[in-house]
């Protein structure tokens, strides 16, 4: 079971990854091996875990710990879980966590281009994408 840490100080630097870093800082364009991504719901966290990503911190509503997120916690090893009531988390992040759970993961190494294209029938090359979540929207 991970270590559960009650949030008592919103300025704690350990919470920066969830509240004070920009997308560009999380991606760490100049040092991609240090890049981070945030999974923003139990379903997305489960997918990341299934793909082999390892979380280094979680942010979670207190009521989720013994409820819907119990299965996620069992898979997260020693990653610290920062927790508080919904209102405190909204104050920290600037928005209400709709599913009550966030997880911070280190970005995995990218596979070689040859491996990605090996069985592909089509390949799209997109340059200068700032926010990949908008692709296809």
Where are these regions (language model features)?
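A glycine-rich helix N-cap at a beta->alpha junction
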Residues: 73-94
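Boundary-proximal intrinsically disordered activation/regulatory segments immediately upstream
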Residues: 1-68
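Glycine-rich phosphate-binding loops that contact phosphosugars or nucleotide phosphates
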Residues: 103
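Solvent-exposed alpha-helices and their adjacent loops that cap or buttress functional pockets
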Residues: 29-31, 94-96, 115-119
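Short coil/turn connectors at secondary-structure junctions
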Residues: 54, 78-79, 99, 119-122
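A general structural signal for well-ordered alpha-helical segments in protein cores
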Residues: 14-18, 45, 89, 98, ...
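RNA substrate-binding interface of SAM-dependent RNA methyltransferases
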Residues: 2-5, 43, 50, 87, ...
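A short acidic, glycine/proline-enriched capping/turn motif at secondary-structure boundaries
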Residues: 64-66, 87-90, 98, 108-111
């Amino acid at each position: 079971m991970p270590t559960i840490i009650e949030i008592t100080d919103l300025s704690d630097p350990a919470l920066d990854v969830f509240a004070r870093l920009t997308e560009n800082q999380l991606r760490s364009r100049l040092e991609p091996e240090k890049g981070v991504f945030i999974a923003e719901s139990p379903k997305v966290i489960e997918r990341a875990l299934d793909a082999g990503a390892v979380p280094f911190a979680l942010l979670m509503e207190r009521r989720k710990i013994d409820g819907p997120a119990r299965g996620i916690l069992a898979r997260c090893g020693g990653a610290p879980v920062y927790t508080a009531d919904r209102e405190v988390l909204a104050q920290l992040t600037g928005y209400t966590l709709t599913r009550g759970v966030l997880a911070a993961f280190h970005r995995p190494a990218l596979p070689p281009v040859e491996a990605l294209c090996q069985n592909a029938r089509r390949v799209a090359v997109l340059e200068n994408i700032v926010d990949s979540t908008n692709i296809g929207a």
